[in-house]
A protein has these predicted regions:
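A conserved glycine-rich beta-strand in the N-terminal activation segment of trypsin-fold
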Residues: 24-33
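Glycine-enriched alpha-helix->loop->beta-strand junction motifs that scaffold or abut catalytic
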Residues: 82-84, 157, 206-213, 231-236, ...
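His/Asp/Glu-enriched, well-ordered alpha-helical/loop segment
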Residues: 253-337, 344-353
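Active-site beta-loop-alpha junctions enriched in small/polar residues
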Residues: 69, 91-92, 117-119, 166-168, ...
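Hydrophobic faces of well-ordered beta-strands that scaffold small-molecule active sites
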Residues: 60-68, 86-88, 112-116, 161-163, ...
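Acidic (Asp/Glu)-rich catalytic clusters
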Residues: 102-107, 154-155, 225-233, 260-266
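Divalent-metal coordination cores built from histidine and acidic residues
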Residues: 76-166, 170-184, 188, 237-239
Length: 353
């Protein structure tokens, strides 16, 4: 006689899914749901558990837009638009902290990580831009001033420090100050994100120890040797669609070429849109996904770009879900990802009963 399947303890339920992405594709799977936690149990084939609901599609950690400016948009539609978490890379500290708090308590509000104010050289970008209030910017000229700015971001619970290196008509840090700011941030335990614009700025950032480029370099075509150096030292936030918003431009072509070679060289790509910069959709940007696909990223690489910090075994609070499994046709991958929804783990059984 076959043994009856085990009964889940009170508060636990088991669900199945057609596929699960946890830094890699797990295939048909069984997952255990306990409150707001969803844990991968193992392959569906041969499982001794008895799922009480089936998720008809693929489960991911919550999709992240790794470059937004929530002070320039209404973030209310992000979760409904398929984005579970954002990294705000320039904002008023008090305002972005309020949005962080909302994301921690409201199921329909996007989860927020943030860098806080932009740290730049005196007169540096974006102090000359109308869209950037002075409260968004810390202009620093000395190591003492940069230390104070970094300490302010740390005290505000920032997840990163953002610096700007825009040499197109604006001052940038000297080599000494650049390395000083990066070292101070690292000593405080925070990664450094840099805005690199103008000849040589991406390579300056990498040489100084910057961790993440806020944009794919678009003002110059980098050499293969430079691309290789970047691939071994930084990750890049894509932001391709801002160069034309679906229209062909020289900047889009340069950035796409740089990102294609960067990804082929093994570089880490993060999905990001620079939301707030022009006519971009609130939520998943299908044009950005199509640009990533055209740059050579396959389904696994796009998943990795959308989930930059994947768990190896579990999800908390929310998941991203796409009906079906990743298509075998490369031309269909981007549109498949653009259909993602954000779901609360606590409601999965009711959603898919």
């Amino acid at each position: 006689m076959n043994a009856a399947p085990p009964v889940a303890p009170a508060g636990e339920t088991y669900v199945s899914a057609d596929d699960v992405w946890l830094g890699g594709w797990r295939g048909p799977s069984v997952l255990r749901s306990t409150g707001n936690i969803l844990e991968w149990v193992g392959p569906l084939s041969g499982s001794t558990e008895a799922p009480t609901a089936h998720i008809p599609g693929t489960v991911f950690g919550g999709f992240t837009d790794s470059h937004v400016h929530l002070g320039l948009v209404d973030p209310a539609g992000l979760v409904a638009g398929g984005i579970a978490r954002v990294l705000d890379l320039g904002n008023n500290l008090d305002e972005v902290r309020a949005l962080w708090g909302l994301g921690e308590t409201e199921a329909t509000a996007v989860a927020v990580d943030y860098a806080g104010a932009l740290i730049t050289a005196p007169g540096g970008y974006p102090s000359d831009r109308s869209w950037a209030p002075s409260s968004w910017i810390r202009e620093v000229a000395t190591p003492e001033e940069s230390a104070a700015a970094v300490s302010e971001m740390v005290a505000a619970a920032a997840s990163a420090v953002k610096i700007t290196l825009n040499a197109v008509g604006a001052p940038v840090f000297s080599e000494r100050m650049l390395r000083t700011v990066v070292t101070q941030a690292h000593n405080a335990g925070l990664p450094v994100v840099a805005h690199p614009e103008g000849a040589g700025q991406a390579m300056r950032a990498a040489a100084a120890g910057v961790d993440i480029l806020a944009h794919t370099p678009w003002t110059e075509r980098l050499s293969d040797d430079e691309i290789s150096a970047l691939a071994s030292s930084v990750s890049i936030i894509s932001t391709l669609d801002i160069h034309g918003y679906g229209q062909a431009t020289e900047a889009f072509a340069i950035a796409s070429d740089n990102l294609s070679r960067f990804a082929a060289a093994g570089g880490v790509v993060r999905y990001g849109t620079d939301l707030g910069n022009g006519p971009l959709p609130i939520g998943i940007n299908a044009r950005e996904l199509a640009a990533l696909s055209a740059a050579g990223l396959d389904a696994g690489a796009i998943a990795a770009a959308l989930v930059p910090h994947p768990s190896s075994a579990s999800f908390v609070e929310r998941i991203s879900w796409i009906p079906g499994v990743a298509p075998a046709d490369p031309d269909a991958v981007a549109s498949w990802f653009s259909t993602a929804s954000v779901l609360a783990i606590s409601a999965l059984k009711e959603t898919f009963a």
